[in-house]
Amino acid sequence: MSTFESLLARNEGLGQLFYQQMLEDPDAIAIVDGDYSLTYASLHAQATHLAQRLDQNDFVHEEPVGIVVQHGILDAVAQVAIIYAGGTCVTLDPALPNQQIERRLNRLRARYILVDTPNKSRGLPFSQIEVEDLPISTELIPTDSPYPVNLSLEHRSHLIHTSGTTSESKAVQIVGRSIVHVANYAPFEPVVKTDVVAHGNSTSFDVALFDIWAPLVQGASIAVLSKATLLDLSAFEAAIDRYKISVMAITAPLVNLAATTRPGMFSSMRVVLMGGEAVNIPAMRKIFEAGPPVHMVNAYGPTECCVYCLARKITLEDLDTGAVSIGKAIGNNIATVCDEMGKPVPDGEEGELLVGGPGVSPGYVNLPGKNAASFIEVPDLVDANGTPYHMYRTGDLVKRRPDGQYDFVGRFDHQVKIRGYRVELGAIETVLMDTGYFSEGVVMKVDSKAEGAGSALVAFAVLAPTAPPSAVTDATAALTAALPHYMIPNIHIVESIPLTNHAKVDRKQLADWCLQRQEKNMCAMQDKVPSEGASTRDQLGALWATILATPVREYSDNDDFFGLGGTSLQASLLISLIRRTFNTEVSLLALYDNSTLGQLAHIVDRNQGGALATVQNLREMWIADTMIGDALETPVGPVVDWRRDTEGRVFLTGATGFVGAFLLSDMLKMPGIHQVGCLVRAPDEATGVRRLRHALEKYNLWREEYLPKLLPLCGKLEDPWLGLGEQRFREIADWASVIFHLGALVNYTQPYSWHRPANIEGTVNVVRLACTGRSKALHYCSSISCFGPTGIINGTKVVHEDGALMPHLNALPYDHGYAQSQWVAEELLRRLIHRRFPIAVYRPGFITGHSETGACNPDDFFSRLIRACSSIGCYPGLPNQRKEFVPIDYVTSTMIHIASSSLSLGHAFHIVPPTREESPEMNDTMSLIGELTGTSIQPVSYREWIEQLSSTKDLSLQPLLPMLAEVVIDGMTRWEMYENMPTYENTNTLRALASCPDLPKFPMVDEALLRKYLDYLADH
């Protein structure tokens, strides 16, 4: 009896099988993503905790639960939790529009969704449970926990949507039996405990079932690979080596792409399963010449057969013959070829492939008609008990060889696979024609002749008589709004659609015409470029012509690579060709940032000229700097409760600054705080005390009774030992109960490099203090400026407190060095939080004066702005801009309250106005200031304001004038780029404050408060 048959006999579901692996080796790594990993025990604990939350409702057996979670560890946690509770996972691509997600879940009558932080504010109309990135101690899970619930292998574990637009998509039922079968036949031998299986496929793909569940039920490990990593071949190859990946399921186009520049990157692996498109023989030959994996497998399988059902181990003999079959049925699956009447056909004749066995789905949900047509019984095929097999009609035309292998011929219908996605061409045609711009339209998959470029969807369309000149652009926008990204075709306008002799669309003629045009375009462009002495622009144009099938004879500087239909795979190919042609590196991120021909030529020229300060170089430097804390050892032992009577010793940085002074004053007033050690730049303690005293006196905060509690610590952030010396550093590390890190260099005109020593290296040094000796919480004060102008650059509508920072990276080049340093410092801390460092992050908006006394910082930007605008009689009219004003006393009291609870650790908190209505726009604020000061300050254009500012004798804003006047992109300055600011979600903050109703309410910066500020500034 095989292992699979033994498991069938035991009939334990996926949850129990994972649980058994956890019991056998709880400390084994279950899943890793960068520096963040979960052991089997940790994954079990998190899944159990989430299952309990899910099961508090009237949860029923096989309840469909939507998963709207980004690719990574939390998605695996969500799936295990749902199965632990006895439900069914409905894996959904978070990139889908809300409308499509709603339709899919409503058709399943789903009531619940699991979401992560980036997706929790989408407003999806279902009962929502957040998958939190929190460590759950295994000790908190009772030994008599009901999870996982007892399930059989016939339990419906997943619903995978396949094919078509949302209204036409089919939800394929997957049962545990099918997944266990895949895990034990991968495809010729099982996944084993020593394997590391790559998880690079979207969880909306059935292939991701193999990525996640094959290792989990077999006791192996999962290594998460992002899409960006897969498309950056250098990073992809490094990830294989770093994680020691041994097994991977990958789409054929990615394999083909790797073959162009790194054909040997799979040589260390045990199994590589490729599918989605036909094997590219020249590309595969390169891989075999460079060193293939032990098993290079051409795998075939529609979703209805759970990942794959036929497979062929590719051999040199296959490559010599020029044809790689889709192999034979694997494991306990069976296959046959039938004619249109459902009767078997002889070997060598074309027919439809039918597949049966443990991998076949029970059918689609709520689609009895499609089930009757697609899932049938063949009387001549029976099992050992004489029962006819449940067979799936694949719709694929194949031929069976005498040795039992199957050769793929084509499709009965016009369903195709593009980059691993199955696409109904008719669904695209429907949306295309619904635009009303075309009288006829045909969508096809066309294979590109360019090396490694793969296939593309092309729509051939005849313009309607009333179509506007913008028909193609408008139609593309309509398609983008209605369909997933992989279903958006390149639209080619034709005079008529050719027909065959049988009055059917002549798809072959259309494909030939498209390829001829592509080849003609390539030749035309290449003929225009001399072999030597050609400009960078012309050489890049030739490279574009070898990749893109566009009707353009000569590209202009404003032509956009992606606007012309370039895909992410083609972008990777372009990067490789640029490297080969120009002997210079341009990263994928740089290409996305500079995707027009003119921009890209400029980037290539600058790289060749040795220019170092390009946007991409800066971004790579920032990313590298986020990793300088990775060598720090994770603190051990429980985190000190700093509010205990026997503790109360605070280490504070930045105490001489505006926020630090108010926070220090608040802490010195607290009876439970016994001493505050302040890191201060001073040659001796006496000078240090004077500096601290002066900082508090500046805002009328100093009290003589503070002196016994005040401990000056003379040092500096940039020094590894904080300027204290190693011995004193270790003494303070043991002395301190908690750390508040507010110290930073803040200069709006200096670059990142100037901020790096204090703000980045200094943060690492403070973290080192926190994890030296006793494990102490670190509370870090950042700013909402760490996101940069993400609203205008990324179109970000909402910034989540615990959301990923990486999506905002491409907004940072357009902000000042301080904001850039805050992003780096936060991402550095985020990496440490993932390693369970006890850290909390606080992001205030623009901090204004005290709500009672009016005491404010006369040197901050807002105070300088008030003085300058009052002097010149105008202010810049900036629509849709807010500063998110928060009074200083609200900021410090909020920080102290939140920091007093250990629940704050591992989270970020936006300290901003609680509601949008309490955050006035800048234009309204400046207008109100004019009324209160009795001056006539009028809104003017930003350019006019800068001109007025440049000629005034008022020096308030002169130090900031270079930053204010510098144009950074598209004619806009840094301040102008904060138009259409996102909402800074503050759920964590409001939840924490709700636990203490005695805290004062948020003091909105309104007319009364502005009057206090103006009075204070007038006296100072």
From Swiss-Prot:
Pfam families: AMP-binding, NAD_binding_4, PP-binding. The modification O-(pantetheine 4'-phosphoryl)serine is found at residue 568. Residues 652-894 are annotated as: short-chain dehydrogenase/reductase (R) domain. It comes from the Eukaryota. Keywords: Ligase, Multifunctional enzyme, Oxidoreductase, Phosphopantetheine, Phosphoprotein. The keyword Phosphoprotein applies. Residues 21-419 are annotated as: Adenylation (A) domain. It is an enzyme of class 6 (ligase). Its EC number is 6.3.2.-. The keyword rRNA-binding does not apply. CDD domains: A_NRPS (cd05930), SDR_e1 (cd05235). Hancockiamide D displays potent cytotoxic activity against murine myeloma NS-1 cells, suggesting a potential antitumour application. More interestingly, hancockiamide C, the likely end metabolite of the hkm pathway, shows potent Arabidopsis thaliana seed anti-germination activity, but is inactive against the monocot Eragrostis tef seed, suggesting that it could be a herbicidal lead targeting monocots. The herbicidal activity of hancockiamide C could be due to its phenylpropanoid-like structural features, which may act on the plant lignan pathways, and hence warrants further investigations. Transmembrane segments: none annotated. Pathway: Secondary metabolite biosynthesis. One of its GO terms (molecular function) is ligase activity. SUPFAM superfamilies: Acetyl-CoA synthetase-like, ACP-like, NAD(P)-binding Rossmann-fold domains. Residues 526-608 form the Carrier domain. Belongs to the NRP synthetase family. NRP synthetases are composed of discrete domains (adenylation (A), thiolation (T) or peptidyl carrier protein (PCP) and condensation (C) domains) which when grouped together are referred to as a single module. Each module is responsible for the recognition (via the A domain) and incorporation of a single amino acid into the growing peptide product. Thus, an NRP synthetase is generally composed of one or more modules and can terminate in a thioesterase domain (TE) that releases the newly synthesized peptide from the enzyme. Non-canonical nonribosomal peptide synthetase; part of the gene cluster that mediates the biosynthesis of hancockiamides, an unusual new family of N-cinnamoylated piperazines. The NRPS hkm10 and the NmrA-like reductase hkm9 are proposed to convert two molecules of L-Phe to the intermediary piperazine called xenocockiamide A. Xenocockiamide A is then converted to hancockiamide D via a series of hydroxylations and O-methylations. This is Non-canonical nonribosomal peptide synthetase hkm10. It comes from Aspergillus hancockii. The lineage of its organism: Eukaryota, Fungi, Dikarya, Ascomycota, Pezizomycotina.
